[in-house]
Amino acid sequence: FSVNDVMAIGAAAALRSEGLRIPRDAAIAGFDDIETLRDFRPALSTVRLPLEDIGRLATRATQRRLAGDDGDGAEDASPGDITGEVTLRRSTEAAA
C-alpha cells in the first residue's frame, strides 16, 4: 500500500524492473484515485476521498477564523469525520 497513487505507480515500475508482475507476484494499492492514472494497467486499487466535502469543511473553518472566531475548534471537522471509499481494482486481485 502506497501513501498515494503516484507512489504506487513508482513502486509498480520498480517491481516490473525486477521482473515481477502485478498482481500475480505483488499487489499494489494507492491512495487518491487520481484521474490521470485511469489508463494505468493493471487498474490500480486505491482509496478515494471526498475532496469536495474536505474543501467545504476547510472553507468553513477558515471563514470562522477570519471572522474572529478563535473558539476551541469544536465546530471544525476532525479526521474521523472524513471517510474514504476503498476502490478495489485489478492491481490487488489474487493470483490465479
Please give the residue ranges for each predicted region.
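Flexible loop/turn connectors
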Residues: 1-96
